[in-house]
Amino acid sequence: MNIRRKNRLWIACAVLAGLALTIGLVLYALRSNIDLFYTPGEILYGKRETQQMPEVGQRLRVGGMVMLGSVQRDPNSLKVTFTIYDAEGSVDVSYEGILPDLFREGQGVVVQGELEKGNHILAKEVLAKHDENYTPPEVEKAMEANHRRPASVYKDPAS
């Protein structure tokens, strides 16, 4: 093997080692930010394709609806407990903090936290879903103003 080929081989090995090290460091840095999404039914019975169930202590995101009558607030602190459900089951959630303005019973939420024993989630963050038909107040006012205009405004000037 001549010197030129040896140098190319060493350069290729160095590039591959550097790439592997970079990928390893990125994955190590992101491991604390990777949260898998589950529904309450998937927490209870596992993911449909793989039947993989989350482990106690695993960080995850859970999406579902807040069960009617399940919200309980501690009068002495910001601690709130509630139940989220889907068609296949329900899980209990504990959260300490200020809830979003759109949070209410019967509304969709996504909670991010850790799974504890007994299918209980200790939430670090609660996100309330809004209706897909939501319109900002400014846009709604503009739409109402346009609908009140006389019909002559909408006619084609060429006709």
Swiss-Prot record:
Ranges per topology, Periplasmic: 30-159
GO BP annotation list: cytochrome complex assembly
Top-rank lineage group of the source organism: Bacteria
Keyword Lipoprotein attached: no
Bias kind Basic and acidic residues: ranges: 132-147
Predominant localisation class: membrane
The protein's role, per its UniProt record: Heme chaperone required for the biogenesis of c-type cytochromes. Transiently binds heme delivered by CcmC and transfers the heme to apo-cytochromes in a process facilitated by CcmF and CcmH.
UniProt cross-references to Gene3D superfamilies, sorted A to Z: Nucleic acid-binding proteins
Segments on the Cytoplasmic face: 1-8
Protein species of origin: Shigella sonnei (strain Ss046)
GO terms for cellular component: plasma membrane
Lineage of origin: Bacteria, Pseudomonadati, Pseudomonadota, Gammaproteobacteria, Enterobacterales
Transmembrane segments: 9-29
Membrane topology: Single-pass type II membrane protein
Family from the record: Belongs to the CcmE/CycJ family.
Alphabetical keyword list: Cell inner membrane, Cell membrane, Cytochrome c-type biogenesis, Heme, Iron, Membrane, Metal-binding, Signal-anchor, Transmembrane, Transmembrane helix
Positions annotated to bind heme: H130, Y134
Entry's Gene Ontology molecular function annotations: heme binding; metal ion binding
Region spans: Disordered: 132-159
Name the UniProt record assigns to this protein: Cytochrome c-type biogenesis protein CcmE
Alphabetical list of InterPro entries matching this protein: CcmE, CcmE-like_sf, NA-bd_OB-fold
Subcellular location: Cell inner membrane
Gene: ccmE
